[in-house]
């Protein structure tokens, strides 16, 4: 966002991440503050934390959500299940979301390469009448290549299903099962790893992304 001309300040707790922010060029007292002070100064508060951290930090954020501000999320969990998380925003602010379909690291890398990562967006609450404009501007600002509309609830459930079901669940389970099966049948750790993780991540997935599964099946040697 800073590279795209937005006036960005960072709110960060003291610790290793705070020190990393300083090393990355954020200046204490100018562009780097405590979470409380950053929320007080900001007109758009971007809550870019894990689900558990959002819940723990919410009491610090909420008092600074004054009328006309925008509360921005990159994931719909806290709002979708706010009866359990306790994250209930005041009615006189905008509540918006842009959810990149990938990691923050991927988003940054693609931006530096001149590419964009697809993102979904949603508006939960439009108190100012400008929530849509704010959302689209921020979506472009973070480096989205394409934006498609969703809701907080749909984003939260699809993200959890994808990550816990396939992306962080099934894939890891399949790779581990194949690796262990090969090892049980006498294959070396190197061979088992290369026939499992290495071939998938370094060879097949780039082809899958570029050409699709029909091409993969048509060109499979086995």
Residue ranges and their predicted role:
Residues 18, 38, 54, 189-193:
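Small-residue helix-packing motif on alpha-helices
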Residues 7, 27, 44, 145, ...:
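Residue-level detector of anion-binding/catalytic polar loops
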Residues 13, 24-80, 88-103:
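Rossmann-like NAD(P)-binding element
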Residues 1, 16-19, 54-57, 105-107:
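Short glycine/serine/threonine-rich phosphate/pyrophosphate-binding segments
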Residues 141, 147-222:
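Helical "substrate-binding/catalytic lid" subdomain
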Residues 1-29:
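NAD(P)+-binding Rossmann beta1-loop-alpha1 motif at the extreme N-terminus of oxidoreductases
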Residues 2, 19-22, 136, 140, ...:
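Class I S-adenosyl-L-methionine
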Residues 72-164:
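Rossmann-fold dinucleotide-binding core
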